[in-house]
Regions:
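Short, charged, amphipathic alpha-helices and their helix-cap/turn boundaries
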Residues: 94-112, 148-163, 198-209, 262
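Terminal-appendage/accessory-domain detector
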Residues: 1-11, 15-122, 218, 223-233, ...
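Extended, well-ordered alpha-helical scaffold segments
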Residues: 28-32, 51, 78, 145-157, ...
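Active-site nucleophile and cofactor-binding loops and adjacent substrate-binding regions
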Residues: 121-127, 147-151, 169-181, 226-228, ...
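Well-ordered alpha-helical segments within folded domains of soluble proteins
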Residues: 127-134, 180-187, 233-236, 296-298
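Active-site cavity-forming subdomains of large catalytic enzyme subunits
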Residues: 140-146, 163-172, 185, 189-202, ...
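Secretory-pathway/luminal and periplasmic proteins that interact with or process carbohydrate-rich
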Residues: 66, 84-86, 157-165, 209-216
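Hydrophobic alpha-helical hairpins/lids featuring a short glycine-rich hinge
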Residues: 110-163
Length: 470
């Protein structure tokens, strides 16, 4: 794999709440299905192929490392108890049906909070889409190019639909469980070579299963991990049903009682059609370098930069700093506002705690433990209107540190590391992969899995390649 080029299309500015679509909105779902079904590997630009390979690499590291977590083991036991066919790999737990493997691997993918994110849609696309694509690719003995195409097609559906309903959708719904159900169905449908009518049915059946509520964040419940797993499972189910002739709602997006009306206060259908078939959304993908909520990442980067510049220890920070304030954007604040997390998972969704830990030298590139910073400064978190105005095209933060001698230092950032606008190299993603997989499965397996990822384009049979990585 080569590095992505720095000059990437970035997500457009916030939604207007108006519906604007060059295609009649009454034909919106059908138009999307036609483009997804017709896509071929030759349609993918070179950059999109590279970005798809990078996304698979980034996903696999999180999925393998997460597969030994308690929540992943629970999902694996449930899948094993179903006692169904052995069509696809369950990381760290043998084999299951394609849908069962996708469920278990989807859960594992999202546990560490190191899987990718897309700014405009707020979808963690890899965790639901790639497990669905890999499981069906194994079952169908698809080659690597068919698999990569399916992943890109899945991202295309999920990210465009997520952008169309955000930001209002995000108030209650977790787009990784909702919009990505469409993406998983599209990826599975691509591998099954569904025609346009069948793809339309698959999208219809996917949409009626789309779910995932933010209430998990109130107590750090494992339900968040279930969202991508169930989206992957439901996507395969929708595509398999469509192949059999099972019909789905033909206007599941734009219908009077469809996805748009049910799950958002406003929508912009042009987000689905703008550049459809020519501009691939996977090239807008963002990679996470910190194992916590993406809304904290710009602020964490600023805190780490502040500490590095001064070479301070945690004791120095506590001694020298009088006040710390982080300003962020409104929708992100609603997710990371908890200033007194009581559990490890709540800590990952606490801006104040994450920034305090960063200032005290906690490394977020690996899974980190709650309470790792034994003493840490108080961080005040507020919403800034100018930063909210930049969202979701940017995920900005402003950090103001006041020292005890009266010095005030203010830094700001619009894009954390790992965004297309602030990119990481493929070498850095490979280093992240090895740092996640090596400690869990050993360096030999880590390098073997890395090799499988970097050679996917030339793979003749995904089942043969991925059944041997563990």
């Amino acid at each position: 794999m080569n590095d992505r080029q720095a000059n990437k299309h970035s997500p457009q500015a916030g939604l207007t709440g108006e519906t604007a679509c060059p295609t009649s909105e009454g034909a919106l779902t059908r138009k999307l299905a036609e483009v997804l079904a017709a896509a071929t590997y030759g349609d993918l630009p070179a950059d999109a192929i590279i970005d798809t390979q990078r996304s698979v690499l980034d996903w696999l590291g999180s999925a393998l490392a997460g597969s030994v977590a308690p929540a992943a083991r629970m999902a694996q036991r449930v899948v094993a108890a179903l006692g169904i066919s052995r069509e696809a790999t369950v990381f760290g737990a043998g084999r299951s049906s394609a849908a069962g493997a996708a469920l278990a691997n989807g859960v594992a993918s999202h546990i560490l909070e190191l899987d990718d994110i897309h700014k405009g849609s707020t979808v963690h696309a890899a965790a639901p889409i790639i497990p669905a694509a890999l499981a069906v690719a194994e079952r169908e003995h698809a080659d690597g190019k068919r698999f990569l195409l399916a992943v890109a097609v899945g991202y295309e559906a999920a990210l465009r639909i997520g952008e169309a309903v955000n930001p209002s959708h995000y108030r209650f719904w977790h787009p990784t469980g909702t919009a990505a159900t469409f993406g998983a169905a599209a990826a599975a449908g691509s591998l099954l070579k569904l025609n346009a009518a069948q793809m339309l049915d698959a999208l219809g059946s996917a949409g009626t299963q789309a779910a995932g509520l933010w209430e998990f964040n109130a107590d750090g419940a494992m339900s968040k991990h279930l969202h991508p797993g169930k989206a992957a499972f439901n996507g395969i189910l929708a595509a398999d049903l469509a192949r059999e002739g099972f019909t789905g709602a033909s206007r599941i997006l734009e219908g009077d009682r469809g996805f748009f009306q049910a799950m958002s206060e406003s929508h912009d259908a042009s987000r689905i059609t703008d550049g459809l078939g020519t501009r691939w959304k996977i090239s807008e993908n963002c990679y996470k370098l910190h194992a916590c909520c993406g809304h904290t990442h710009s602020a964490i980067d600023l805190a780490l930069e502040f500490r590095r510049e001064r070479g301070w220890t945690a004791a120095d920070v506590l001694e020298q700093v009088a006040d710390i304030r982080v300003e962020t954007y409104g929708p992100g604040y609603e997710i990371v506002r908890n200033s007194a997390p009581a559990t490890p998972y709540q800590a990952k969704f606490s801006m104040a705690y994450c920034v305090a830990c960063a200032l005290c030298g906690v490394c977020f590139s690996l899974p980190w433990s709650f309470g790792q910073a034994k003493a840490y400064p108080t961080v005040r978190v507020t919403v800034a209107d100018d930063l909210t105005a930049k969202y979701p095209a940017a995920w900005p933060a402003r950090l103001t540190v006041t020292l005890r001698d009266g010095t005030v230092i203010t830094r700001s950032a619009d894009f954390p590391r790992g965004n297309p606008e602030n990119p990481v190299s493929t070498a850095e993603l490979e280093e992240k992969f090895l740092s996640l997989v090596g400690p869990v499965f050993g360096p030999a397996i880590a390098h073997r899995a890395l090799g499988a990822c970097t050679s996917i384009e030339d793979c003749a049979d995904m089942a043969e390649a991925f059944s041997r990585i563990l």
